[in-house]
UniProtKB/Swiss-Prot annotation:
Belongs to the metallothionein superfamily. Type 6 family. GO terms for cellular component: cytoplasm. The keyword Metal-binding applies. It comes from the Eukaryota. Keywords: Cadmium, Metal-binding, Metal-thiolate cluster. It comes from Caenorhabditis elegans. One of its GO terms (biological process) is response to mercury ion. All cysteine residues are arranged in C-X-C groups. These are thought to be the metal-binding sites in other metallothioneins. This is Metallothionein-1. One of its GO terms (molecular function) is copper ion binding. Induction: By cadmium. This protein binds cations of several transition elements. InterPro entries: Metalthion_nemt.
Length: 75
């Protein structure tokens, strides 16, 4: 039960570890809900949400992504 990172804040208040998936997430976007445990990669524009993790006009984010382009390289 360490500190929690905010999705809107790319800088984690706690400079230790995130409850998401490693400190890497902390630096980028971490879900404030441990139940979701999801993180947005740096491929997002910056206004990504952890709950849905969907990018406005950028590459796939993670979970829900609008496949507007013809790229189907989803893990």
């Amino acid at each position: 039960m360490a500190c929690k990172c905010d999705c809107k804040n790319k800088q984690c208040k706690c400079g230790d570890k995130c409850e998401c998936s490693g400190d890497k997430c902390c630096e980028k976007y971490c879900c404030e809900e441990a139940s979701e445990k999801k993180c947005c990669p740096a491929g997002c524009k910056g206004d990504c949400k952890c709950a849905n993790c969907h990018c406005a006009e950028q590459k796939q984010c993670g979970d829900k992504t609008h496949q507007h382009q013809g790229t189907a390289a989803a893990h």
